[in-house]
Structure formats: C-alpha cells, structure tokens
Amino acid sequence: MACILKRKSVIAVSFIAAFLFLLVVRLVNEVNFPLLLNCFGQPGTKWIPFSYTYRRPLRTHYGYINVKTQEPLQLDCDLCAIVSNSGQMVGQKVGNEIDRSSCIWRMNNAPTKGYEEDVGRMTMIRVVSHTSVPLLLKNPDYFFKEANTTIYVIWGPFRNMRKDGNGIVYNMLKKTVGIYPNAQIYVTTEKRMSYCDGVFKKETGKDRVQSGSYLSTGWFTFLLAMDACYGIHVYGMINDTYCKTEGYRKVPYHYYEQGRDECDEYFLHEHAPYGGHRFITEKKVFAKWAKKHRIIFTHPNWTLS
C-alpha cells in the first residue's frame, strides 16, 4: 500500500512539474523570446509564438471609418512590421525579413518600388497624414490601383476631414474611392483624434495644442498598431538620444529622397515654437510603451533601460 501511495505521489508531482514547465515555456516563447533572439542578432520576425497557429477573430476599431461603406475598420495582426521612412533604412537589406511579417505598416507616401531590398515589397496598412494625401494623389494608380489590397488610414483635423462637403481632404478621398472602387480608405474619427491628443497629454504632461505642436504620423501608427497587433517590430526608427550619440550615422530624413539631415530635422521640430512635431518627445514615449507591450526596435537597436 505504501508503494502504491508513493507511486501516486510521484506521478502527481511529475504532472504538476510538467504543467508548470509547459506554462513557463509558453510565457517565455510569447513574451520574451523575440527580444532574446534580437539580442543575439536574430530577427524577431522569424519567431512564431505558439498562439500564432490559429487565427483570432478580426478586431473592430470604431475610431476608423471606411469612406465608401461607412463601416468601422476590422483588423487583427500577429507580428507587425512598422517600417520607418527614415534614411536609416538605406543599405539595411532587410526587405525579405520585413515581407515575412504578417502585417506590414508604412507611413505617408513612402514607396517600395526601387527600395525593395532594404524596405520590402508588401504593404498591408499605410497610415497617412492629411497633408500627405495630395502626395498619394500625384501617383494614384500606384497607391490605389496596383496596391488596392492595402488598407489606408488617414488622420487629420476636423476642418479637413468633415463630411458636410467642406472637408477638403475628405472630399479628395471620397472622389478617390469613386475612381478606384476597390480602394480601402479609412478616416480617423474626431473622437479618435481627441483620444490621441489625450494620450499625448497623459504621457508628456503637455497639452498638444497649447504646446504649439502637431502629432506625427508615427504617433497615430503606434496607437493603432498597439490595438491591432500581437507584437510589433519597428525598423529604422531612432530613439530620443540617438542624435546626441558620438559618431551617429548621418542620413537623410527620408530614405527615398535627398533632404535635410535626419537629426537636424528632429532638433528643428522639437524646438519649434509653433507647428512642429515633437519627434524626440514622442520617441521617449515609444520607449516607455515598449516596456509594456511586445515592441522591439532594430536598425538601429534600442536599449530600453
């Protein structure tokens, strides 16, 4: 009898130990292992967590409304790649790695043609500023015909996005979906815009309007991506201290055009009394979010203290 009880105890302990081991493996796999891979020079996009083997239902994002159908955005991604427009992307040769991500995010009018080796070919979501819509319309066939599987999320102030016929940007978008009926164009609601302003104030302690600044497209991209993505890999984005680092890599502000040095642009906007983007301040916030969410930054790598 004693032997039987001893054997049952051993089996019970073994079962509990095996269960705890599997639980730990799952947690390490889904939360920390992509970061470990990145530390050892392995791209996190190659790691597929256990939970990726099934598809979750699409999430509904009520702050983004389809121009044609007036339906809210439905989007749910596993591992997202957010590709920066920065000149840091030049020569990185991570295009194939980026294209293996389940959802690939780009911003404004950043092209892929001619830059595939560095930034990839595919685009699933493109977040666009109201000021960049005219840039898309300079090459509408490329953005809305050839790339008609891309979801476009447009953000802008109410005066430009109003639907009563007086919203100049909204009118452009409405005309575009008339010409390209398969284009998937969503606009950010006024309520969502206010929410994004509120997040800025909460994170920085500053009122966005009173501080004389505008949120960047990167800010709107992050807020949607954190709602839609299981994990996020950001390519080519510099952190808030990069431009003060000795011997930093000097690159153009955009990878696809010659222009002002990236760091010069950052400093100009950060200290502009009115009408600037607080790029450096935003990067501090992104680093804070990365400690709470599954977000990694590479090319260059970020060290999160």
Swiss-Prot record:
Annotated InterPro entries: Glyco_trans_29, GT29-like_sf
Top-rank taxon, per record: Eukaryota
The protein's name in its UniProt record: Alpha-N-acetylgalactosaminide alpha-2,6-sialyltransferase 3
Residues the record marks as carrying a glycan: N148, N239, N301
PANTHER family per record: ALPHA-N-ACETYL-NEURAMINYL-2,3-BETA-GALACTOSYL-1, 3-N-ACETYL-GALACTOSAMINIDE ALPHA-2,6-SIALYLTRANSFERASE-LIKE (PTHR45906), ALPHA-N-ACETYLGALACTOSAMINIDE ALPHA-2,6-SIALYLTRANSFERASE 3 (PTHR45906:SF2)
Cytoplasmic side: 1-8
Disulfide bridge partners, by residue number: C80-C229
Gene this protein is translated from: ST6GALNAC3
EC category name: transferase
Pfam families linked: Glyco_transf_29
E.C. numbers: 2.4.3.7
Tissue: Expressed in brain and kidney. Observed in the epithelium of the proximal tubules, marginal expression was also found in the distal tubules and collecting tubules.
GO biological process: ganglioside biosynthetic process; glycoprotein metabolic process; glycosphingolipid metabolic process; glycosylceramide metabolic process; oligosaccharide metabolic process; protein glycosylation; viral protein processing
GO molecular function: alpha-N-acetylgalactosaminide alpha-2,6-sialyltransferase activity; alpha-N-acetylneuraminyl-2,3-beta-galactosyl-1,3-N-acetyl-galactosaminide 6-alpha-sialyltransferase activity; sialyltransferase activity
